[in-house]
């Protein structure tokens, strides 16, 4: 059986306007701190993860800040995907330029 959460995000062009290419994403992706840490609740280790407070500075759209300060911040990893894909596209374009210079 499936143990994850399945969800879809509406992305139909008919619901959008002012559509343009997104700005540079590589710098902001490079600014995201990927951390290793241990969870206080059970001591389990995460080799790769984020700290919501740090991510909030770079990608605020990916962090849910609760109304009450005693509640925990939550990261929506799906909101990071477009930024990461844009950064990969930029790297791919840079690689193509470098290939042309070598040849």
What label would you give each PLM region?
Residues 1-77, 91-103:
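C-terminal intramolecular chaperone/autoprocessing and neck/assembly modules of extracellular spikes
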Residues 81-84:
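A detector for long, heptad-repeat alpha-helical coiled-coil rods in eukaryotic scaffold/tether proteins
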